[in-house]
Each structure stands twice: as structure tokens, then as C-alpha cells.
Regions:
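Short, conserved beta-turn/loop elements at beta-strand boundaries and strand-helix junctions
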Residues: 90-94
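N-terminal secretory signal peptides that target proteins for export/translocation
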Residues: 1-15
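Lipid interaction determinants
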Residues: 32-84, 96-156
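Bacterial N-terminal signal peptides
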Residues: 18-30
Length: 156
């Protein structure tokens, strides 16, 4: 007589219970991953950006590239030049501060597997800090195809 974790009674096969276990496993693996329109949490931000180079575009159409090194340093490039600084995650906000230009902290939302949308924090009427409605920039890990819903465009 066979028994096991997926059998409801000795010798019986239970598809329903197997499906329940499979669904539970999938849900456990997806815990902590922001869905579209939801801000990412600190651990997800750090895991997504540490040691990665993002290529991206600001909402004004300017392209940039930024490398987030494991030691917390950052290297930034755009059409106007390059800069260095530091990156960190503070209270679920992604922060970048530079030697030669102003830095800031941002809410980050994920769009698909490889598109990160950055929003400036603003104070809501009730006093909470929330993402601004209009995105500041979008970026993607250059090692994979971007999954942003509208592909970036260059203005020529």
C-alpha cells in the first residue's frame, strides 16, 4: 500500500491536492515580486539593481546609462557627459546621489520582467509620501530585451 504527501487515502491519486501543492509552490516563489503598478520593496530593488547596468530614458526623451556596483557606487552616462556617485535603498525608495549633479530617491515599479519605472515621491493630501503620477524615467537591464509597454524612441 502506497502513501505519500499527495495521496488523500492509501493507494489513491489526488489530482486536486497535487494542483493545490503546485499552486502553493508557485505563490511562494512569487512572494515579494511587485506586480505592474505596485511599488517594489527594498529587497526586490536591491536584488534587481545590484551589479547591473540599466539603459534608460527620461520622460523628456533623454537617454541615459547607469551602472550600480556591488559596493554601492554608481557610474552615470548621458549625452551631456558622465558622473559618479552612490546608490542605496532607503525605506523602499531607490536613491542615487552624484558628485557633480543633484540626486534623489524614487519609487520603483516593475513593468514586465525587464522594465523599471521610476517615480518622484510627493506628499499626498493626507500626508503620506506617494509616487508622483507621471514617471520620471524608465530603465531596463541592458543584458536582456526591454519589456516596457511602449518602446523607447529617439527624437531625431
Amino acid at each position: 500500500m502506497k502513501t505519500g504527501p499527495f495521496l488523500t487515502k492509501p493507494g489513491a491519486k489526488s489530482i486536486g491536492l497535487r494542483l493545490a501543492w503546485a499552486a502553493a509552490a508557485v505563490m511562494a516563489l512569487s512572494v515579494g515580486v511587485a506586480e505592474a503598478g505596485q511599488s517594489m520593496v527594498a529587497s526586490e530593488i536591491e536584488k534587481s539593481f545590484r551589479g547591473v547596468t540599466l539603459d534608460g530614458i527620461y520622460n523628456d526623451g533623454t537617454f541615459f546609462s547607469e551602472t550600480y556596483f556591488d559596493d554601492g557606487s554608481i557610474r552615470y552616462h548621458d549625452a551631456a557627459g558622465a558622473d559618479s556617485g552612490d546608490w542605496s535603498v532607503r525605506e523602499n525608495l531607490f536613491c542615487t546621489f552624484y558628485e557633480g549633479q543633484q540626486g534623489a530617491c524614487f519609487f520603483v515599479e516593475r513593468e514586465g520582467a525587464n522594465c523599471f519605472i521610476f517615480f518622484e515621491p510627493v506628499r499626498a493630501a493626507d500626508g503620506r509620501i506617494v509616487p508622483r503620477e507621471i514617471w520620471t524615467s524608465r530603465g531596463w537591464n541592458r543584458k536582456a530585451a526591454a519589456t516596457c509597454s511602449k518602446p523607447p524612441e529617439a527624437v531625431i
